[in-house]
């Protein structure tokens, strides 16, 4: 599934992605790419995540123990490339490989308790590990032990002897000529030691090269385990769900984690949203500041989470498989490219309609940058064009009559409640007052869209000097509309 960086930013997808926290270097690198899975890969990913999630819930494995083993693991991308290209004879690279193999051997018996979870061949991993592990070596570190080669033992002993002789001569006040001879001898011995160490490292790398396939498999296995474990921990932290593929996009008691965190951070609360969008184009109407944009963003996140095998922030959810998700929102900045806001919108529509494949379109008040009459007419045409291509979509708008002949479903934000003034309530004119009166829940739309703009303005403290005139004008317009109908 393709989605533009701008659409990702609009949804808050990058902030959500930051909440998914694999602990290993390789896992974190992979997660930053927001991997969208093929259908076959998705099925296997879902199966493994469910097995691991159930094991965590049942206490068969401990997330903290697994996390401690995964946390220090390096990425082997560079080490494996060097090894396969004929290199790899460097202590640091071999050290990284041994770290991973050791962790795999430690993790295998723990994950074996998760019936059905795929494992790598323990014997093959042990054989690769044995190439890097000599008797007496630290278990998780690679060191070039003297016991690996008689020549290495001899070269190290000679280097030590030469260094001691030089230090003793300096301490005894030896002559310059004597010190020069000893210095030259020590340097020769040191160079010889480096040559022998290089030869031994090359032999280790050569022996390890025959195990390259095992190392690659083990490295991928431990990275996937990290990714899956972090997905399960995220689901548990959210109390979320694993979204299921379906012909509909349905969310039960969902919330936008990024928006919720901001609200809670300033002492507020958030309201969960539920909706069920059938195949085709659906509409969403409601008051200004009523949560329409957040509902669309949540829908986009569920599509992304579903396609990526991530948990969704909802009690339950289904998602549609599509080739792309497109967002129509925020084109007002188009003036930077020599276009008016309306011109930028039109260019975005044209680009959208040139796309191929199956798609889902999220449109946040499109056609709002021109006159209401022209905007409603253009939006009607855009919705029809999206539907004619067999795409799905959700269009948020204030044009309540638009799309009625095409839309598969229509939703509305409940809007402002009538609540009597209470002692201790937030003062009128504050955002807190508006939030306390706004009902952000979604309901199936019934009739024309509610118009709460004047009430919202009043709650935000706009004075009667403006509002009294606005009410008279609106009443006059509504009266004229009723007479003409």
Regions found by a protein language model. Name each.
Residues 1-160, 218-221:
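Conserved amphipathic alpha-helical "coupling/scaffold" segments
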Residues 37-44, 68, 89, 96, ...:
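Catalytic cores of large soluble enzymes that bind and process phosphate-bearing ligands
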Residues 51, 75, 79, 203-207, ...:
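A general alpha-helix detector
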Residues 53, 77-80, 98-101, 105, ...:
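Short, well-ordered alpha-helical packing segments
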Residues 58-59, 204-209, 282-286, 365:
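Glycine- and acidic
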Residues 78, 102-105, 136-260:
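Conserved P-loop NTPase architecture
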Residues 84, 107-114, 232-239, 309-311, ...:
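Short helix-capping/linker segments at secondary-structure and domain boundaries
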Residues 238, 245-485:
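ATPase nucleotide-binding head domains, primarily ABC-like/P-loop NTPase cores
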């Amino acid at each position: 599934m393709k989605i533009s960086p701008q659409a990702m930013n609009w949804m808050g997808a990058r902030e959500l992605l930051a909440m998914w926290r694999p602990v290993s270097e390789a896992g974190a690198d992979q997660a930053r790419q927001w991997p969208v899975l093929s259908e076959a890969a998705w099925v296997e990913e879902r199966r493994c995540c469910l097995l691991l999630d159930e094991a965590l819930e049942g206490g068969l494995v401990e997330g903290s123990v697994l996390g401690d083993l995964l946390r220090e693991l390096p990425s082997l991308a560079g080490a494996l490339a060097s090894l396969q290209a004929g290199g790899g004879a460097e202590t640091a690279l071999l050290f990284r490989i041994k770290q991973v193999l050791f962790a795999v051997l430690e993790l295998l018996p723990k994950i074996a308790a998760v019936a059905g979870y795929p494992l790598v061949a323990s014997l093959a991993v042990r054989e690769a590990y044995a190439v890097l592990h000599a008797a007496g070596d630290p278990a998780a570190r690679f060191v070039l032990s003297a016991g690996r080669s008689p020549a290495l033992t001899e070269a190290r002993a000679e280097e030590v002897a030469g260094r001691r002789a030089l230090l003793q001569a300096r301490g005894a006040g030896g002559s310059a000529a004597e010190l020069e001879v000893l210095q030259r001898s020590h340097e020769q011995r040191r160079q010889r030691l480096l040559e022998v160490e290089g030869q031994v490292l090359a032999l280790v790398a050569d022996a390890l090269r025959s195990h390259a396939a095992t190392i690659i498999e083990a490295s991928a296995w431990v990275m996937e385990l990290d990714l899956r474990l972090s997905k399960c921990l995220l689901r548990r932290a959210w109390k979320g769900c694993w979204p299921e593929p379906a012909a509909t996009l349905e969310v039960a008691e969902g919330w936008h984690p990024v928006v919720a965190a901001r609200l809670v951070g300033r002492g507020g609360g958030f309201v969960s949203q539920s909706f069920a969008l059938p195949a085709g184009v659906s509409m969403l109407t409601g008051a200004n500041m009523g949560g329409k944009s957040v509902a669309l963003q949540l829908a986009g996140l569920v599509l992304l989470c579903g396609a990526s095998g991530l948990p969704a922030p909802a009690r339950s959810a289904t998602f549609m498989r599509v080739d792309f998700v497109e967002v129509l929102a925020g084109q007002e900045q188009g003036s930077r490219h020599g276009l008016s806001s309306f011109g930028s919108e039109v260019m975005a529509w044209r680009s959208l309609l040139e796309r191929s494949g199956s798609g889902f379109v999220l449109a946040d008040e499109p056609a709002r940058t021109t006159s209401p009459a022209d905007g409603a007419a253009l939006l009607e045409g855009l919705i029809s064009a999206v539907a004619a291509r067999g795409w799905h979509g959700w269009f948020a708008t204030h044009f309540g009559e638009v799309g009625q002949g095409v839309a598969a479903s229509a939703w509305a934000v409940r809007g402002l409640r009538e609540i009597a003034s209470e002692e201790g309530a937030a003062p009128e004119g504050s955002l807190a007052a508006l939030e306390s009166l706004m009902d952000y829940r979604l309901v199936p739309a019934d009739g024309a869209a509610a118009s709460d703009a004047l009430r919202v303005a009043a709650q935000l403290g706009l004075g009667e000097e403006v509002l009294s005139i606005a009410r008279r004008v609106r009443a006059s317009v509504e009266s004229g509309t009723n007479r003409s109908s």
